[in-house]
Amino acid sequence: MTEGKYSNKRQINLQQAGNNPNVKFNNYEILQQKYDIKTIHQMDSLLRATGIGYLPVEVKYGAHVSFVPRSDYHFSTANPQILEKLDYYLENTITNVIDHGDMLQVPVEGHHSGEAMETRLTTEDEQMMFTESLSKYSDKVIAACGGTHDDPEFASRLKETYISAIKPIYERFGIPYFPNSLVVEFKVPVMKGNVQVGSTSLWCVVMHCSGKPASKKLGSVEKTYDQGLGVIKKFNAYFGKNVCPDFIIGGHFHANADCDYMVERNIYNKEGKATGSYMHTIRVRSNATIQDSNSSSFNRSFPDVLIPSFSQYDIHYRVNSNFNPNGMNNSPKYIPVVTEFPILNKSGELSMKAKEYMTNRKDYNFTEQVKKDYSNADFKTLYSDFENGLNQ
């Protein structure tokens, strides 16, 4: 029988033991382990050099970028009812999820103003609860980053404790985890009717943020903006790019606030000559928290932070019919259409928009195309790729 393209058979290499010609062993696992270790070492070296993770995400089926950024769950001190509602939404909605810090409370005695003593749950208890929650929608979590509570020091004991607690959970589900910041590039097809006419990239800077909260909520947004610009400048310098982010998403401050910043961007033709400019929107979003009322000094800084503010983002691009590739332009070739809405309302229930999105973003038209693409694949490959594609 001919071995198919998607065969899961592997080559077994029987290596003869040097000290006993009658003993043989299979060194495949050893070679694979060495390969994995070298790959991880190279990736970690890049992360240490830049402090920034980079994740390209291809929107494979459909033309919408869909994602939910989550931070500051502080799981063991979070409101159980709100946790349950968010789990239900993520489990039943076609969307990507990005975690960016303080998902666990990680009680550490002697740190963070005695906050560690406000819960009777241990770190092991919290890990078990978070693992159970994550297992419901782990296939939708494309990456995770950050998590330093209120300590920005790179080698702080608190950060070390957090990473040690949460990294194994993400690795268990195959979710890439970046200790610091993350730049996500969504590669988006652009459609005109039912025909793909091009592609573009949506850039998101995702991080946890650090430092004390400002006296006003908008001040925390400004800190998020400044820290996000620092990340993208370092990213551009290291990779030789000229990326201007579409989103800067942070947490840490529990600010429940957002602001749009306008920056001027040039438009270039195929020869690299500037043929105009336009005002580009950088959407800066600072998450709230779902901790109970007195579990954080940040909560006392901003009394309304307990209003759930986790949002669903949906972005697609439309073709600019007025764009002239050979002339001057004051708007880009592809224009983003951004939809965002709160997943929960102020009562802690699923919002009407969230219910509608959860129900309607189920495009079954892709099913036949996927079956055609993977007609010779085993079921596991078909299911995994199909789910991953839809989730993007």
Language-model features: locations:
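Acidic, histidine-bearing metal-coordination/catalytic regions of metal-dependent phosphoesterases
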Residues: 1-69, 392
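Core catalytic region of metal-dependent phosphoesterases/phosphodiesterases
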Residues: 53-64, 70, 75-178
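Active-site neighborhood of phospho(di)ester-bond hydrolases with catalytic His/Asp-centered motifs
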Residues: 68-72, 96-102, 141-148, 177-179, ...
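An acidic, phosphate/nucleotide-engaging active-site surface
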Residues: 155-207, 211-219
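A short C-terminal boundary segment appended to hydrolase-like catalytic domains
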Residues: 305-392
